Amino acid sequence: MDVMKGTTTVGLICDDAVILATDKRASLGNLVADKEAKKLYKIDDYIAMTIAGSVGDAQAIVRLLTAEAKLYKMRTGRNIPPLACATLLSNILHSSRVFPFLTQIIIGGYDLLEGAKLFSLDPLGGMNEEKTFTATGSGSPIAYGVLEAGYDREMSVEEGIKLAINALKSAMERDTFSGNGISLAVITKEGVKIFEDEEIEKILDGMKAKSKKKTTKRGRRKSK
């Protein structure tokens, strides 16, 4: 089912970690309805997810999945595995296929036995386990181009963060329904880390400084 609602979210696997990133713009037709929309959620100690599509449907899924993860931990004493979490959501979405949740989901998690895990789900419950990267939303075609060009399975977490940010930045420059900042999370064996705005700004400043340095070096070579 093709649902490309306004937003851009990306997920990728690198160096035994999962990186999730989203923009912050919520649109209502051609209106920018919210410039600080939350599209990245922590579900469990080792699982986070991104949302794209209908806000009400997406938030209902977040509440449901968070509650199910807590119940699983109460019953078993363990955190719900990422595959079990994604499969549960797939079954929930499929059971509502007559009146579907109009949303696209990316689930990223870390399994202490199997390592980094990444899944994408469509509104009818179709689930794919992604071995490299994925993207959703109206800006996803642009984000995919950047991810295809720059992805390396062996890249470090730092390199993966920069690639995810570059994919989002490119989408925000060309897609009118994406923009207004970036949300970022890294999931490792240590758990889910959701970055503060100040931390993201610091990363962006570092990327700008590095890019400016490269441009200056090229200019000097040409002048010679």
From Swiss-Prot:
GO cellular component, one term: proteasome core complex, beta-subunit complex
Pfam family, one: Proteasome
InterPro entries: Ntn_hydrolases_N (IPR029055), Pept_T1A_Psome_bsu_arc (IPR019983), Pept_T1A_subB (IPR000243), Proteasome_bsu_CS (IPR016050), Proteasome_sua/b (IPR001353), Proteasome_suB-type (IPR023333)
GO molecular function, one term: threonine-type endopeptidase activity
Propeptide residue interval(s): 1-6
Active-site residues annotated for this sequence: T7 (nucleophile)
Main location class: cytoplasm
Domain of life: Archaea
Location(s) in or outside the cell: Cytoplasm
Catalytic reaction(s) noted: Cleavage of peptide bonds with very broad specificity
Activity regulation text: The formation of the proteasomal ATPase PAN-20S proteasome complex, via the docking of the C-termini of PAN into the intersubunit pockets in the alpha-rings, triggers opening of the gate for substrate entry. Interconversion between the open-gate and close-gate conformations leads to a dynamic regulation of the 20S proteasome proteolysis activity.
EC number: 3.4.25.1
Stretches assigned to coiled coil: none
GO biological process, one term: proteasomal protein catabolic process
Keywords tagged on the record: Autocatalytic cleavage, Cytoplasm, Hydrolase, Protease, Proteasome, Threonine protease, Zymogen
NCBIfam families assigned to the protein according to its UniProt record, in alphabetical order: arc_protsome_B (TIGR03634)
Family from the record: Belongs to the peptidase T1B family.
Function in brief: Component of the proteasome core, a large protease complex with broad specificity involved in protein degradation.
Subunit relationships: The 20S proteasome core is composed of 14 alpha and 14 beta subunits that assemble into four stacked heptameric rings, resulting in a barrel-shaped structure. The two inner rings, each composed of seven catalytic beta subunits, are sandwiched by two outer rings, each composed of seven alpha subunits. The catalytic chamber with the active sites is on the inside of the barrel. Has a gated structure, the ends of the cylinder being occluded by the N-termini of the alpha-subunits. Is capped at one or both ends by the proteasome regulatory ATPase, PAN.
Name of protein: Proteasome subunit beta
